[in-house]
């Protein structure tokens, strides 16, 4: 669940996730973020004043702006431009093997995987790159794999209003590989279907067959 983030200048234009908002937080400034990283270095037993770590707080804060850039983007903007002159094409549009990375909301360690996304157009289509961008918008947030899967499908269904959407995500979770049970190489698969993909088994079979070919 996202909290609305207020900019230092009280700009409330950043998109809010569809989940209900229970808290409103003021976004910390860059200096506060860097100070927080410095505190973590001290807590880990490091000396933030040694040569190799002097610029680390600044670098981490800058990296987080990119890694969690999905909070400042909205699928509505990405999927807002569509095309209707597609020669009557109304069959499945599938973009598969979309590589992505995200971060587990429980431990803030990476989730690395691939997404396969399909939809059945209802008179209009979007540029193929837009589907990949929607994946990145939700991946570049603190997430669970189940949430990313559902959010991708929901946004495409809600904005494009196709006859159906299918999403499969295959990913490795570093919280399982690097800590706790330390099971390297294990993968998690999640799926969600809407519309015809949910109601018609043959459409699900087509989707699953195509992503495996």
Curated annotation (Swiss-Prot):
Q: Which Pfam families match?
A: GTP_cyclohydroI
Query: What keywords sit in the KW lines?
Result: GTP-binding, Hydrolase, Metal-binding, Nucleotide-binding, One-carbon metabolism, Zinc
Per the record, its GO cellular-component terms are: cytoplasm
What biological-process terms (Gene Ontology) are attached? one-carbon metabolic process; tetrahydrobiopterin biosynthetic process; tetrahydrofolate biosynthetic process
Q: Which reaction does it catalyse?
A: GTP + H2O = 7,8-dihydroneopterin 3'-triphosphate + formate + H(+)
Cited InterPro entries: GTP-CH-I_C/QueF (IPR043133), GTP-CH-I_N (IPR043134), GTP_CycHdrlase_I (IPR001474), GTP_CycHdrlase_I_CS (IPR018234), GTP_CycHdrlase_I_dom (IPR020602)
Q: Give EC number(s), comma-separated.
A: 3.5.4.16
Q: Which GO terms describe its molecular function?
A: GTP binding; GTP cyclohydrolase I activity; zinc ion binding
Which annotated residues bind Zn(2+)?
Answer: 104, 107, 175
Pathway where this protein functions = Cofactor biosynthesis; 7,8-dihydroneopterin triphosphate biosynthesis; 7,8-dihydroneopterin triphosphate from GTP: step 1/1
> Member of which family?
Belongs to the GTP cyclohydrolase I family.
Subunit structure and binding partners: Toroid-shaped homodecamer, composed of two pentamers of five dimers.
User: In its UniProt entry, what is this protein called?
Assistant: GTP cyclohydrolase 1
In its UniProt entry, the species of origin is given as: Brucella abortus (strain 2308)
């Amino acid at each position: 669940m996202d909290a609305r983030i207020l900019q230092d200048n009280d700009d409330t234009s950043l998109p809010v996730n569809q989940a209900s908002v229970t808290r409103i937080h003021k976004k910390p400034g860059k200096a506060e973020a860097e100070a927080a990283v410095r505190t973590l270095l001290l807590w880990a037993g490091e000396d933030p004043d040694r040569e190799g770590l002097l610029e680390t707080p600044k670098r981490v804060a800058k990296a987080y702006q990119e890694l969690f850039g999905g909070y400042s983007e909205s699928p509505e903007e990405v999927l807002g431009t569509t095309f209707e002159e597609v020669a009557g094409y109304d069959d499945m549009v599938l973009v598969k093997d979309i590589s992505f990375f995200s971060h587990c909301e429980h431990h803030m360690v990476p989730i690395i995987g691939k997404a396969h996304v399909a939809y059945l157009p209802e008179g209009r289509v979007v540029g193929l790159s837009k589907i990949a961008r929607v994946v990145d918008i939700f991946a570049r947030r603190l997430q669970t794999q189940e949430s990313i899967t559902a959010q991708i499908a929901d946004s495409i269904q809600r904005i494009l209003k196709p006859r159906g959407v299918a999403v499969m995500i295959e990913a490795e979770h570093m919280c399982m590989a690097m800590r706790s049970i330390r099971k390297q190489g294990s993968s998690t698969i999640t799926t969600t279907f809407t519309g015809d993909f949910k109601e018609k088994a043959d459409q699900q079979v087509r989707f699953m067959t195509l992503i495996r070919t």
